[in-house]
A protein has these predicted regions:
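Long amphipathic alpha-helical scaffold segments
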Residues: 6, 10, 17-50
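Short, small-residue-biased leader/transition segments that mark boundaries at the very start
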Residues: 2-3
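Amphipathic alpha-helical packing elements
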Residues: 52, 224-263
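Intrinsic disorder at enzyme termini
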Residues: 252, 272-273
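Active-site metal-binding loops of divalent metal-dependent hydrolases
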Residues: 62-64
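Glycine-rich ThDP/TPP pyrophosphate-binding loop and its adjacent helix/strand module
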Residues: 35-40, 45, 51-58, 68-84, ...
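Surface-exposed polar/charged interaction patches
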Residues: 15, 32, 240, 255, ...
Length: 273
């Protein structure tokens, strides 16, 4: 009994290892339900046997919630240090309510409340979360690298603390040429053009004396301008406000270049000696 109790306590924060340890304990308890000494305790424990293994806790939400109207709550949760996982589907717009601009909407993108294109850059939610130093953070795009997404999800789940995984999510409001059937290809293009970057920040690496930041995408190899012009949320601005469109698109491209350069610097920081 002491051995099984030790195994349960040792795996209480590991959902992968917790299940086998719990199954072994349950099997042992079931063998001893008629034992004169521990039978009653075994029966009581088995009543709540479904509660023994560590549960995988995930919060799901969109960018309107995470970046904007629910940011205060999200920030409170990750700042608490509690072992909770958060997955954000970043469509860069309020998708469920009709396509209104949010703080996740990038420069130059047309949306409700930003009919002339958004003039200020997108909020950097990942950077805010990384600033705590004890939050696991990942930015992903399944169409660009599904292995990286899987790795991020597994790492987030195994991390004993708050985790934030932000995934690029093409949306019908983007007006993708070719439609939503090519959403995965659009994600790949977004990363190749430097429009979206994928990376991971794992605080456990810092504890090991390693750089906690890992950049998982190469330098942009495709045209940023060609990418955004493949979506109505951007190319429509060239028809309604052509001069403003040029100014905002140039600004957006510069923001993207500076963002990648900054991420490269983070990734190149030396490990602690």
């Amino acid at each position: 009994t002491t051995l099984f109790r030790s195994q349960i306590l040792d795996t209480v924060c590991d959902s992968t290892a917790s299940r086998p340890a719990t199954d072994a304990l349950i099997a042992e308890l079931e063998k001893n339900v008629d034992d004169a000494k521990v039978g009653e305790l075994a029966k009581k424990t088995l009543i709540d046997k479904d509660e023994l293994a560590k549960k995988s806790m995930w919060i799901f939400g969109g960018d309107g919630w995470a970046y904007d109207i629910g940011f205060g709550g999200l920030d409170h949760v990750i700042a608490s240090g509690e072992n909770v996982n958060i997955l954000v589907f970043d469509t860069e717009v309020y998708s469920n309510t009709g396509g209104q601009a949010s703080k996740a909407t990038p420069v130059g993108s047309v949306a409700q409340f930003a009919a002339a294109g958004k003039s200020v850059k997108k909020k950097d939610l990942a950077a805010i979360a990384m600033s705590y130093g004890y939050v696991y953070v990942a930015q992903c795009a399944m169409g660009a690298d599904n292995n990286q997404v899987l790795k991020a999800m597994v790492e987030a789940e195994s991390y004993n603390g708050p985790s934030l995984v932000i995934c690029y999510a093409p949306c019908i409001n983007h007006g993708i040429k070719g439609g939503m059937s090519i959403a995965q290809q659009e994600e790949k293009k977004a990363v190749e053009a430097g429009y979206w970057n994928i990376f991971r920040y794992d605080p456990r690496r810092a504890d090991e004396g390693k750089n906690p930041f890992m950049l998982d995408c190469k330098a942009p190899s495709a045209s940023y301008r060609d990418f955004i012009m493949g979506e109505v949320r951007y190319n429509s601005l060239t028809r309604s406000f052509p001069e403003r469109a040029e100014q905002l698109f140039a600004k957006a491209e510069k923001v993207a270049e500076e963002k990648y350069a900054h991420l490269e610097k983070l990734a190149s920081l030396p490990d602690a000696e």
